[in-house]
Amino acid sequence: MSISWWEISVLCHPNLEESIFWRLDQFGCSGTARETKGKSFLIRAYVPKMQAQTLDLAALSLWLKQDAILLDSPPPLTHWKLIDDEDWASSWKDHWQPTEVGDRFLIYPAWLTLPQDGDRLILRLDPGAAFGTGTHPTTQLCLESLEMRLSVPNKEIIIADIGCGSGILSIGAVLLGATKVYAVDIDPLAVDAARSNRHLNQIHPATLVINQGSVAEVLELAPEGVDGILCNILAEVIIELIPQWTALAKPHAWAILSGILIDQSQAIADTLEQYGWVVAALWKQGEWSCLHVRRS
């Protein structure tokens, strides 16, 4: 039996994108997509009709406005409408096309026919309900940072991806030559999406290990520690996780951190310094930053 879905459309200032994705995820939305509308972003997301009433949607709209106030940004415009199951399955995908990232990656939607030629590393992806399609500046900054970090061949490199979402960064690391990647996320839907994308990219489960959890779960899997840490989540969550990385990171480990607005980067840097890390570089794209850090 076909079910109906709410299509939620949010027109927002670009620096609200991360908080809106997070809020929509907390609301239970699936299949988010983003497109540019002039100087603004239009974000679409979907939630089953049975899971949300109009009062719930009105509350969501209010929360998004409150989030914007906290981030000192203009309030977003939120609209919603009902669509049927078939429309949901195809609607958000219509707005997502292959995306070149950095010098080496081509992020390729799983439902499109693969190109016959080209010299880029093809990273096939169907994010499902998980964050990470390659269109967000933080994801692109992380992938570009991985290109730089893994440009010199290493005999062996083990990486942890904390809050892996769709698995896009983990898969990118494997394609660039990482020996082993441990990817974890507290969201079971993200774990399912990451495992599906691992299969799409024909990566062996022993090379990319994906489990539900966080730092503690990686420590159980890799008690010897890791050479690199990837973490593209909200800044306040990164601050909470930094103290736990001491036991996880090898003495000369590095980390690539994003999900961080430029004006949040100093607080991250201060916390890193308290726990024996130093910021080696800071890359920017729009309102977003990516920190390259290493153990001091």
UniProtKB/Swiss-Prot annotation:
Name used for this protein in its record: Ribosomal protein L11 methyltransferase
Keyword check for rRNA-binding: no
GO molecular function, one term: protein-lysine N-methyltransferase activity
Role of this protein: Methylates ribosomal protein L11.
Subcellular location: Cytoplasm
Source superkingdom: Bacteria
Membrane-spanning intervals of the chain: none
Keyword terms of this UniProt record: Cytoplasm, Methyltransferase, S-adenosyl-L-methionine, Transferase
Main location: cytoplasm
Species this protein is from: Rippkaea orientalis (strain PCC 8801 / RF-1)
Enzyme class: transferase
Binding residue positions for S-adenosyl-L-methionine: T139, G163, D185, N232
Catalytic activity, reaction form: L-lysyl-[protein] + 3 S-adenosyl-L-methionine = N(6),N(6),N(6)-trimethyl-L-lysyl-[protein] + 3 S-adenosyl-L-homocysteine + 3 H(+)
Catalytic activity, EC: 2.1.1.-
InterPro entries to which the protein is assigned, alphabetical: Ribosomal_L11_MeTrfase_PrmA, Ribosomal_PrmA_MeTrfase, SAM-dependent_MTases_sf
Gene Ontology CC, one term: cytoplasm
Database matches in PANTHER family: ELECTRON TRANSFER FLAVOPROTEIN BETA SUBUNIT LYSINE METHYLTRANSFERASE (PTHR43648:SF1)
SUPFAM superfamilies listed in its UniProt record: S-adenosyl-L-methionine-dependent methyltransferases
Matches recorded under Pfam families: PrmA
GO biological process: methylation
Name of the gene encoding the protein in the UniProt record: prmA
